[in-house]
Structure formats: C-alpha cells, structure tokens
C-alpha cells in the first residue's frame, strides 16, 4: 500500500519534501485523534454494560437480595479498576513479555510516552470487569460479600488478564497477531471480541463457584425436582438486556480499536469503517435470531411465551457471535444465533437434571454459548475478512468456507486451555473460601434475605416486612396493601 509521502510527493513538485512532511503529519495527527476518540467512545459503551448487568441481575434475583446483587456490581467495577490498574493490565499487555504472561507496566509505570493511548487501558478495563460481572450472577443470593471482594480482585487482576494476554497480546502463544515466534497451527486464535477470553472465563469461574457453594435453599425439593425461584422483576431484566444490547455495539465493533484504516488503494472507499458496520450487523442478527429461536423453542418445551427466556437467549447469541463478529458474513451470524439458542436450552436442561443452580444461567449462557462461538468462528470465518483484519494473505480461515482445519484445531486447543486455566485458578480459590467459612452465608441469612441481614434494610421502600418506610396508618395518608392482598384505599379526611 502506498504511503502518504509516496502519494503526495509527485503531486507537489519542487516543494515536495517539506510540503509532504507537513501534510502527512497533519493527516497522521487527525487519524490518531479520530481513532482515539472512537476507542474512547467504545470504552464508554462497554462500561455502560455494567448498568445492564446490574439491572439484569437485580431483576433475576428475589426482592430480598436486590441490594446485595447491586452492590456486587458496583464492587466489580470499583475494585476491578484498582486491581486492573495495579496488576491486570501489566499481565495482559506489559511488553516486552513472554507467550504466557506480561511482565511490565504495573500501575501503568513506564508506559511509552509516545504511542501509548490511555483509551486502550480504559477499554480493556471495561472488558475485565465484564468477566467478573458474569461470575457474580452464578453465585447470587447465597454468597458472602467478602467472597465477592476476593474473587473479583483475583479474577480481574490475574486470571482474566493472563487469558487476554494469550489471545490479544502481540506476544501471546495463541494470538493471531503474534509478532515473534510461530502462530498456533499456523493461524493463531481468532477470538475477536472475547467469546472465549471474556465469556468463557466468566462462565467457567461461575460454574465452579456455583458447584462448590451448592444450590440455593428451596431450589430443589426433597425428591430432587427443580423448583423455580423466580426473579422479582421481569421489567428490570428486559431493561438490563436492552442496555447490554446497546453496549455490545461498543464491545464488538469497538474491538477493532481503530477505524481509519484503509483496506485498499487511496480512493477505494473501502476500509475498517466498512468492517465496523458489518460487525454491528452480524452482532444484531446473531442476538436477534437467538432470541426468536429461544422464544419458540421454550414455547414448545413449556407452553409459555417467557420474556426472561427470550432475554437470556438474546444474550447467548451475543456471547456466541463475539468471537467471529468481524470475520463472518451476516448470513453466518444467523446460524450462530440459531445454534446458540439450542446450546443454552440444552445446557439449562442438563443443569436442572444435575441439580446445578445458577440464578442467571451465566455458566450456561456465557460459558456454553461462548465456547460455541469460538468453534463457530473456526467454521465460518471468511478468507477475505481474515486477510483484511490481520493483514497477512494466505492465513487459515473457516473450515466450511474452504480454509481447512488448522483454525479449528487452534480453537479447540484454546477452549480446552481456557477451561483448564480458569478451573485450575478459580476452583481452588472457591474451595479455600468455603473451607474458611467465607463463601456461603448461613441458612438463616439466606432465608431472611441478605438485604435485611447484611446490608441494613430492603432495596424497596414499602417492602411488606419493612415498617420503616411506611406512613403512619393513624394519620391521613395512604392505606397500604397488606401482605395478604387486602384492598388498597386512600384515606382522605376520614372518607373512603
């Protein structure tokens, strides 16, 4: 591809050298400014997903644990910021490094003064706390607050960054952008925005947490039959799902990191800006297809049109397409979403049979659909898109697209390694916390609800068991509906 100087030099005649340098520097500054702004805006969108996680989690738990689950979401972001700053970013992107882990930039110390964009740190931190948020849903309603603090710091500061180093760092052993050493199976792993790096990590961690804690009291009866412990607000679940959908447009398209990159000669009007738009489309189609497939699949299974199931199916489709969103065609994204819905339905049925309790279906949704997304990418990645994004013609691409099986081999390896790494690190942590009595709350606290026993009161005023927020019935005001459903009436001057 011709450089700026090569293009402008012949056009400017005798003053070519000075004029070319000046104009090219101006273009470079403008390009850097636009790319940095694009990345920063994408980071804001990904961070807004924390609000979506908070609403989704709040609606999916019972009212008596609402304040607790909301506090854990705040904790994920706040503690995650400090631990990712101190340790996580260095383990993920500290250069120079080896293929396993980064070794520099602890506390952002000695980052390059030229060429380092702080927007990149913010963007990567937003991804790290997303992984921690996934895990919190799996262990909701029965976990001690101190356990949240410990696991969140460990996951954000160490476990997740190591995986992101493997796949997204230029030095990582599985990276498709590796600059030193040979690529895994000659291709590396194409996990563009994190079906494996983010969703599998969070899902597998949640799997171990939920397994070690055991199910919530009342989740299964004495005969072992599943008993639904429904969340208290479908409205919050829908709100959270839409906020997550919105944030995914920063999560997936934002993972290009830059937007002003041309894929052809000057004037071709074809570049990364086109790929960004296509990625948003594939993201939309996968999630939408998964939502509709889940709607009808669960209708056949249960006889109901369940909005909670549809929202979970939607998010499962997004989790699956995240790996290959940039390298597949829109029609392939529909296949991705369709299969991800059945993966989620099947894993939920298996979880009920095995008496596995995950209040938000996070292990099944993020772990299972994330793993499917990594496999899907190895099957449907298109040669043209792979060459454009990684800039090296002749790379392996999707098996079903004629690219052979090397990419699939690399992806199978990384799925197994991610599952093993998270299991090796997070399972012992949860076991130690459990052994020390720091993991699960007491049965009495669980029955009463953590909002009352651990957080000083209920999340909602006028909770049936909370008299502190109710007006005095002896004074003119409102007669409240009782716990037994008596009629609500207004007292105005003694007349009803």
Swiss-Prot record:
Induction: By ammonium or glutamine supply in roots.
CC terms in the record's Gene Ontology section: plasma membrane
Any one GO biological process: ammonium transmembrane transport
Domain of life: Eukaryota
Residues annotated as transmembrane: 39-59, 74-94, 120-140, 148-168, 192-212, 236-256, 274-296, 307-327, 331-351, 360-380, 412-432
Principal location: membrane
Compartment list: Membrane
Tissue: Expressed in exodermis, sclerenchyma, endodermis and pericycle cells of primary root tips.
Keywords: Ammonia transport, Membrane, Transmembrane, Transmembrane helix, Transport
Ranges in a coiled coil: none
Tagged with keyword Transport: yes
Topology of the protein relative to the lipid bilayer: Multi-pass membrane protein
Record-level Gene Ontology MF annotations: ammonium channel activity
Signal peptide: none
Family: Belongs to the ammonia transporter channel (TC 1.A.11.2) family.
Function: Ammonium transporter probably involved in ammonium uptake from the soil and ammonium uptake and retrieval in the vascular system.
Name of this protein: Ammonium transporter 1 member 2
Lineage, broadest ranks: Eukaryota, Viridiplantae, Streptophyta, Embryophyta, Tracheophyta
Gene (UniProt): AMT1-2
């Amino acid at each position: 591809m011709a450089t700026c100087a090569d293009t402008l030099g012949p056009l400017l005649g005798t003053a070519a050298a000075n004029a070319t340098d000046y104009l090219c520097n101006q273009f470079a500054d403008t390009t850097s400014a636009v790319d940095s702004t694009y990345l920063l805006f994408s980071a804001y969108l990904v961070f807004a997903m924390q609000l979506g996680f908070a609403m989704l989690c709040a609606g999916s738990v019972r009212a008596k644990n609402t304040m607790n689950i909301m506090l854990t979401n705040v904790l994920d972001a706040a503690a995650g910021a400090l631990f990712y700053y101190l340790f996580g970013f260095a383990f993920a992107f500290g250069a120079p490094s080896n293929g396993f882990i980064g070794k520099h930039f602890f506390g952002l110390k000695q980052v390059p003064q030229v060429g380092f964009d702080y927007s990149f740190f913010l963007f990567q931190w937003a991804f790290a706390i997303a992984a921690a948020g996934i895990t919190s849903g799996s262990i909701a309603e029965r976990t001690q607050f101190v356990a949240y603090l410990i696991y969140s710091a460990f996951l954000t500061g160490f476990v997740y960054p190591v995986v992101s180093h493997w796949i997204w760092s230029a030095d990582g052993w599985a990276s498709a952008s590796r600059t030193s050493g040979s690529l895994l199976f000659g291709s590396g792993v194409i996990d563009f925005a994190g079906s494996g790096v983010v969703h599998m990590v969070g899902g597998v961690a949640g799997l171990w947490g939920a397994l070690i804690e055991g199910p919530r009291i009342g989740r299964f009866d004495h005969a072992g039959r599943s008993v639904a412990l429904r969340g208290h607000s479908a409205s919050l679940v829908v709100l959270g799902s839409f906020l997550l959908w919105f944030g995914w447009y920063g999560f997936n398209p934002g993972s290009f990191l830059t937007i002003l990159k041309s894929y052809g000669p000057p004037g071709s009007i074809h570049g990364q800006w086109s790929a960004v738009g296509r990625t948003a489309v594939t993201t939309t189609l996968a999630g939408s297809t998964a939502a509709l497939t889940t709607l009808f699949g669960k209708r056949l299974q249960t006889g109901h049109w369940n909005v909670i199931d549809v929202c979970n199916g939607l998010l499962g489709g997004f989790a699956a397409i995240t790996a290959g969103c940039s390298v597949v065609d829109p029609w392939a994204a529909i296949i991705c979403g369709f299969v991800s819905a059945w993966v989620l339905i099947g894993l939920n049925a298996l979880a009920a049979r095995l008496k596995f309790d995950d209040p938000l279906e996070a292990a099944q949704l993020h772990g299972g659909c994330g793993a499917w997304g990594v496999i899907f990418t190895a099957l449907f990645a298109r040669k043209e898109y792979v060459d454009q994004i990684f800039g090296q013609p002749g790379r392996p691409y999707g098996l079903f697209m004629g690219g052979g099986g090397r990419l699939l081999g690399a992806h199978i390896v990384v799925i197994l390694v991610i599952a093993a790494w998270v299991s090796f690190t997070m399972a012992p942590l949860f076991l130690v916390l459990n052994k020390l009595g720091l993991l699960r709350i007491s049965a009495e606290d669980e029955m009463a609800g953590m909002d009352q026993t651990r957080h000083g009161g209920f999340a909602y005023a006028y909770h049936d068991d909370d008299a502190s927020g109710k007006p005095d019935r002896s004074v003119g005001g409102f007669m409240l509906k009782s716990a037994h459903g008596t009629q609500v009436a207004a007292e105005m001057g003694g007349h009803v």
